[in-house]
């Protein structure tokens, strides 16, 4: 029996819950207690909705639709539901037209998302093993040391001619391939710098279990530095220009 089915069975004696719904759209991560709480239902036929406490099975809120939004490009309408009046932390079900969907209210509700977003960069590291201590089942051997890289004819200059061998280890894989891009990763670093400048206290506290965790430097800065070191190797010392990418030949 899966978790969803179990919850429905436990609460069945108090409240008849509907089927898990793909019609109802809400914040899957949850809501802060004092935050606005809105859901969207992919139909214009909603007369009432109910919020049920998952722990007790009690109805804690019933409301009418806020408004119906008609699509300018189709004959479909969507109903907006507002349940911002619920502020108590806990797990709940939103019930609409016989369907239901679970959600949570708690402080720091988006912290898991922030942690996962930062940790994803560690998984993209090249040139070092991604160890089970930090990656669990996503561990893997080191990929692409990039300590012997050939300058492509399109990137050759007066000093560094085509075929020159350089070392350019580290950095992040761009996506599902083996390429490393200056522009793409520099954009990511720019966002990291901007958000750290705005919320330094948050990132001083954040720990996402990477090899550098606990070194008295925020994990965000450590992860950013891992790619910055690689970016420095992508600069042509003769003219200061920066190569666009490091990639396989084909």
Please name every model-derived segment.
Residues 23, 101-137:
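Low-complexity, Pro/Ser/Thr- and charge-rich linker/hinge segments at domain boundaries
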Residues 24-108:
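Ligand-binding face of N-terminal immunoglobulin V-set domains in extracellular IgSF glycoproteins
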Residues 188:
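Extended, Lys/Arg-rich, non-catalytic nucleic-acid recognition/anchoring regions
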Residues 120-184, 206-250:
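Extended ligand-binding groove/face enriched in aromatic
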Residues 52-54, 60, 69, 117, ...:
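Catalytic cores of eukaryotic secretory-pathway lumenal/extracellular enzymes that build
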Residues 10-18:
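Hydrophobic h-region of N-terminal signal peptides that target proteins for export
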Residues 1-10:
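Sec-dependent signal peptide recognition
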């Amino acid at each position: 029996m899966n978790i969803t089915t179990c919850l429905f069975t436990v609460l069945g004696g108090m409240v008849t819950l509907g089927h898990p719904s793909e019609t109802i759209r809400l914040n899957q991560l949850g809501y802060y207690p004092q935050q606005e709480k809105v859901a969207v239902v992919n139909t214009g036929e909603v007369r009432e909705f109910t919020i049920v406490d998952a722990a007790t099975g009690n109805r804690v809120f019933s409301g009418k639709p806020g408004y119906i939004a008609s699509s300018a490009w189709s004959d479909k309408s969507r109903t907006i539901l507002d349940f911002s009046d619920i502020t108590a932390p806990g797990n709940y079900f939103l019930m609409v037209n016989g369907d239901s969907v679970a959600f949570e209210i708690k402080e720091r509700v988006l912290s898991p998302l922030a942690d996962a977003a930062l940790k994803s960069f560690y998984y993209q590291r090249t040139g070092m093993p991604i160890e089970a201590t930090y990656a669990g089942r996503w561990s893997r051997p080191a990929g692409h040391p990039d300590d012997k890289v050939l300058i492509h004819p399109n990137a050759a200059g007066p000093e560094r001619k085509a075929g020159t061998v350089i070392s350019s280890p580290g950095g992040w894989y761009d996506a599902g391939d083996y390429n490393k891009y200056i522009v793409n990763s520099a954009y990511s670093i720019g966002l990291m710098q901007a958000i750290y400048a705005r919320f330094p206290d948050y990132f001083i506290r954040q720990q996402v279990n990477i090899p550098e965790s606990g070194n008295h430097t925020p994990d965000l800065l450590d992860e950013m530095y891992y790619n910055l070191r690689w970016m420095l190797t992508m600069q042509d010392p003769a003219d200061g220009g920066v190569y666009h990418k490091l990639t396989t030949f084909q």
